[in-house]
């Protein structure tokens, strides 16, 4: 029975109706209000689960405008609470640092920001201080997919902008 349960892969994901994500529209409005960017894109990934706990990843990317160069600047949130300390060992920063920005035609240190929000019934913090999110495989995968989607949108914007400047 134990072997059969471990091999079974058709378990349904937990219900995500108990989660309260920010939403794509308020996230986009907030980014526009505080950073006045030339480009902004947001995505809300479909609900997923780790260890039986549902979670939703929301992410936004913004470029130009009032954003200082030296990017990417990362803003992390978990259940609507900003994670201000110990960002170096967070799963979000790991995903951002592992991204090959050259693939998306982003060279140097351009002015852009990444805002990530993890909404879950149980955030897997590394420490009792709730300062950073542990790198769980399922959460890392959803963060990576969200960042890849947004990076493609930013790359498309930069290509169109470059063509317009050449003309």
What are these regions (language model features)?
Residues 1-108:
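GHKL/Bergerat-fold ATPase module in large chromosome/replication-associated machines
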Residues 62-167:
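Charged regulatory segments coupled to nucleotide-binding catalytic modules in large multidomain enzymes
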